[in-house]
Amino acid sequence: TSQPSMTDLLDITDDSDPLNIKKGNPGLKPSFTNNFRLFYNNYIEKHQRALMTFVNFSMTRNSISDKVTYDDNTGARTTQPENINGNWNARGAFMFNTAIDSAGVWNINTFTTLAYTNAVGYLSLDGATSQKNTTKQTQVGERLSMGYRNSWLEVNLNGTLNYNHARNEL
């Protein structure tokens, strides 16, 4: 749970800077975040093999975002916190590591990550009044590596590829 700040809850208007007015919102609700996590990990010593995977999901109700209203006549911006819903994200990963020879000196590893975020807030462009904005972000990553290890030397070669795509919707 996340409580709104006391200044956000007070029903007052701070116009000490006439071009940047801040209003409170006594109707703000607390934010609640729910998290869900699954995790699995296994290691087989005989084969020097490891497997790990996890999935996380998080959702926030009543997030707090500042809503801006622009006054064309005075040029003043009025900012007021508002509750907004729709913020959530999901993440997952998979890792596999194993020896590829019977002596166990050569190994390979793969680590894959996936993430999706849905972030909702208010956005004001070119002095306009705030509009609800949703940013949808997708991330995918892969790391591959191969290594050699003996009692006095360890050498690894690895490569990483990451993809990130974000889209905004007003």
Regions found by a protein language model. Name each.
Residues 1-170:
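Exposed, low-structure sequence patches enriched in small/polar residues
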